[in-house]
Amino acid sequence: MEKFTVLTAIAAPLPEANIDTDKIIPARFLKTTKRSGLGVHAFDGMRYNPDGSEKPDFVLNQAPYRQAGILITYDNLGCGSSREHAPWALLDFGIRCVIAPSFADIFFNNCFKNGILPIRLPREVCDALMDDARLGGNGRLTVDLERQVVIRPDGAEIAFEIDPLRRHLLLEGLDDIGQTLQHEGAIDTFEATRERAQPWQTRIVID
């Protein structure tokens, strides 16, 4: 998983609450187990017409938001089903940080597991950041995870809270497997010791 330290990126304003996971990635695209290739389908129903053409009024179809790395929205982002494909689609599009007043719990957790930083900020702060984002390329935001601040285009800083362990894992680029592999030596030692001390627990299958 890619480390998250400091991100300076175009932010896309999406002033809508209760965006569920089916809006983020519709169910018909969940057949794949690959994390790549889903970005083109992110917000599919909001981005495209039935004939597949783009809806020009949707923010991610507009320059410069096609290159957005930050998404700002309203309450309860990621509600609905618990599909992990939702953060996969956002990440494959290029989104590394989502900012909202609140998130659905499972989506919130899945973001961390996939290298996306979800930040909770009050509604009025999200409104102010959306105003910044509407400046387009001149409204880039910086998210400094090490210092736990969002830096606005005018240099003003907004502090945010994050669980210390989750902060550490993002800074180090560690997902669940990477976190486990940090203890690989201790696991190998335990397994070797267990086999010697309790050999009856090791099954030997003879054809």
UniProtKB/Swiss-Prot annotation:
<keyword id="KW-0028">Amino-acid biosynthesis</keyword>
<comment type="subunit">
    <text>Heterodimer of LeuC and LeuD.</text>
</comment>
<dbReference type="InterPro" id="IPR033940">
    <property type="entry name" value="IPMI_Swivel"/>
</dbReference>
<dbReference type="GO" id="GO:0009316">
    <property type="term" value="C:3-isopropylmalate dehydratase complex"/>
</dbReference>
<keyword id="KW-0456">Lyase</keyword>
<dbReference type="InterPro" id="IPR015928">
    <property type="entry name" value="Aconitase/3IPM_dehydase_swvl"/>
</dbReference>
<dbReference type="Pfam" id="PF00694">
    <property type="entry name" value="Aconitase_C"/>
</dbReference>
<comment type="pathway">
    <text>Amino-acid biosynthesis; L-leucine biosynthesis; L-leucine from 3-methyl-2-oxobutanoate: step 2/4.</text>
</comment>
<protein>
    <recommendedName>
        <fullName>3-isopropylmalate dehydratase small subunit</fullName>
        <ecNumber>4.2.1.33</ecNumber>
    </recommendedName>
</protein>
<dbReference type="InterPro" id="IPR050075">
    <property type="entry name" value="LeuD"/>
</dbReference>
<keyword id="KW-0100">Branched-chain amino acid biosynthesis</keyword>
<comment type="similarity">
    <text>Belongs to the LeuD family. LeuD type 1 subfamily.</text>
</comment>
<dbReference type="InterPro" id="IPR000573">
    <property type="entry name" value="AconitaseA/IPMdHydase_ssu_swvl"/>
</dbReference>
<dbReference type="GO" id="GO:0003861">
    <property type="term" value="F:3-isopropylmalate dehydratase activity"/>
</dbReference>
<keyword id="KW-0432">Leucine biosynthesis</keyword>
<dbReference type="GO" id="GO:0009098">
    <property type="term" value="P:L-leucine biosynthetic process"/>
</dbReference>
<dbReference type="InterPro" id="IPR004431">
    <property type="entry name" value="3-IsopropMal_deHydase_ssu"/>
</dbReference>
<comment type="function">
    <text>Catalyzes the isomerization between 2-isopropylmalate and 3-isopropylmalate, via the formation of 2-isopropylmaleate.</text>
</comment>
